[in-house]
Amino acid sequence: MDELPKTLDGSYERILREIDEEKRPYTYRLFQCLVISTRPLCVKELSELSAILPDAGSTLGFENGWRPENPEEFILSACSPLVTVVKDVRNNDANDGSEEKDNDYNDDDDDNAGDNINDDEDRVVQFSHFSVREYLTSDRIANTAHVSHFHILPKPAHALLARACLGVLLQLDYGLDDAKIRLLPLARYAAEHWVDYARFEDVSSDIQDMMDCLFDSNKPHLAAWLWLCDVENSRSRYQRTPSPTRPDAVPLYYAALCGFRDLSERLLRARPQDVNAWGGYYYTPLLAALHKEHPNIALLLLERGADVESRGRQLQTALYVASSCGYTEVVTLLIDRGANPNAQCDDEDVDVVKWTPLFVALQKGRLEIARILLRHGANVNYQDNFGRGPLHIASHHPSDDLALLLLDHSVDSNASDYWGRTALHEASSKGQIAVVTLFLERGAKVDARSKLGSTPLDEAKRYGHSEVVKLLLDHGADADAQMNDYRTAS
C-alpha cells in the first residue's frame, strides 16, 4: 500500500495527479471559475463554464457534446474530492424558508418557466476546504512537477470568464424573454458579472472585439443585456419585465458607467456627439463615470467636450460629485472649463438641499479639494437650507485643518444656523477639542445662545465631553447661564 501524504499539499498533489488526463482540461477550467467567481456558482452554471473553449476567439465555442445529462455528477467526477456540492443558502434568506421560495418552481407550469429554480440552480459548487483555493493559486503548485499545469493565475482566469460571459451575452437579441433565458443557464450570471472580470488588470484589451460587438448600437446585444441586468444598481431583474423593443441605449454612457476607458475612447471616436447624451439613472456619461468612481474616464470625457454644468439626479453637478469623491485633477479641470463652484445641489445621502461643492468636500474631509474651491471663489459664508455654513460642517471633524482653512478665508466664526447654533455649539456637542480650541483662539463667542437658550457649555455637558467643558470654563463660559426652560449648565 502506498504511503499516505503527510501534508495537505501532498494530499492535493496526489489527487490532482490521479485525475484522468482526458478530464484535466475540464477540471482546470472548473478550478479557474471557482477560484475567481464573484459569487457561488450553481451546478448548471459551472457545468456550462467548464465546456467553454478558452481559445474560441471573439465567438463562444463549446466542446463537442458539451452539455452533460447529469451536471452534478460530471463536476464531481472531474474534481472530487477537492470540491463539494451544497445547498445554496442564499435562496433561503429572502423569506426565511417561506412558501414563496417553495412555489417558485412548478414543472407543469410553462407560464412560470422563467421564474423556476430547479435542483441544479438550488445547489452550488464550492471547494471542500479553503486551503484548496490557496494551494491552486500558490507558488508551491507552480513549482511542483506533474501538477504545475493546474496552477491558476488571476489574469487568464478572469479572461476566461470574461470571454465566456460575453459570448453568452452576444447570443441575446431583442426577442429576449424568460423562456429563452432558461435555455441559457449562464445568461443571468454573465449579465451580472462580466464587467467584474473584464475590468481585471488588462483583460479588456484581450476581449476588445467582443466588447465592441456588445456595445454596437446597431446590434441587439446591449439592449438585451440591459433588460436582463439592472446595471446601474447591480441587481439582477429576476422579476419579469417587458422584452426590449427599442435599441435606444447609449453605448458610451454604459461604457463610462462600467469603467472601460479604451472602449469609451473608441465609442467617442465613432460618435463624438454622444459625449453629452442622456443615458440613464445618472443622466450623462460624465456623471455616470464620476458616480461610479472612474475619474480617468471623466477626464477623457471632459477633454472631448463634456458639458461641465450638466446636472444629474438631485440637481448634482459634476463638480459636486467630483468634490465628494476627492478627485483633485477632475475638480481642477472642471473649474478650468468654467464649472461654477457655488452651484446649489441636493444630496439625499445627507438629507439636505442647497449644498455647494464646498459643503460636500468639507463633509467628506477633502482638504485639498476645499482649498481648490476656495481659491476659485467658493462662498465661505454660504448657508444651506438649514442655515448652516461651511464652518458648521467643518466643526464635526476631529482635526482643525478644515476649520482653520475656512477661518483663514474670513469665514464668520459666529454665524448661526436657523436654530441659532454656531459652529462652536457643533464642535462642543461632538467633543472636538482641537476645533473648540481653535474657535476660542479666533474669537468665537463662548456664551453664544441658540434659540432654545443653549450655550456651547450646555452642549458639551449634555454629551459628556469633560475636556471641552473644562476648556470652555477656562475661557470664561458662564456655568450659571440659564436656558430658556430655566435649566443651568451646571
Where are the model-predicted features located?
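Ankyrin-repeat boundary/"N-cap" motif
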Residues: 244-252, 277-285, 311-317, 344-357, ...
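Conserved ankyrin/ankyrin-like repeat signature
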Residues: 262-263, 296-297, 329-330, 368-369, ...
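Ankyrin-repeat inter-repeat connecting loop/turn
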Residues: 274-275, 308, 341, 380, ...
